[in-house]
Amino acid sequence: MAAGRNDPCPCGSGIKYKKCCFAKERSPSDPASLLWRRLNAVDEELARELLRFALKSLGKDFLDRSSDEFFGTSSVPIDVSSPEMQGLGPWMLYCRTIPVKDWLRDGPAKRGTIASAYLQRHASRLDAFSRRYLEACVEEPFSFYEVEDVTPGQGLEMEDVLRGERRYVSERSASGMLRPRQLVWGHVISLESLHLFAGMGSIPLEPIDKLEIVHLLAWLRKRHRLVTTAVLRREDASVRGT
């Protein structure tokens, strides 16, 4: 029987398998590595295509309006190379709900995101993998995730604090920087049986900051009883403003 990630390593080191030979056995051709390489190319290409679609369909001031809503102020200049774009970009394209009246052309019949409107109008332009990726990004809202364990260079065991779900997120760069008990505001999607970050806030939160998220959770439960994916979409502004 193959060793589980949390089982003692078969090599006899006494260390958990995921901290020992698991990482060594991961090759550039394993599913996560192959998916990562494919995703990097698809993500950049789709982001450019969605941005072109948004500017054409919503007007040139779309970026300014999105930034104002995201930061709650109009005083933050947009700099695509800034760390803040790490969270703003994915939220703007995949999660920000656009009123029907804002669309100049190619708009949906009801409120929706840029990505969902693009899928309605131009899904036929996408290959199957790109379409699945875009659909996964549309389905998932941003939430707060607490790091429970880290396998550097491979991924993180994380808990969605608001929905109470645990996931192993395949993530190379963040797994080298984040520590257990830190929290991130992130956009975790499910694709090809893996969980991946499609977007993340630029600054990790420390354990002391969790109290504010617990207060948010209590407020959400008071309003909705059960915190679901649909609730997080509906309460995006409150979650983002925490």
Where on the chain are the PLM-derived regions?
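Acidic/negatively charged segments and metal-coordination signatures
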Residues: 1-157, 161-242
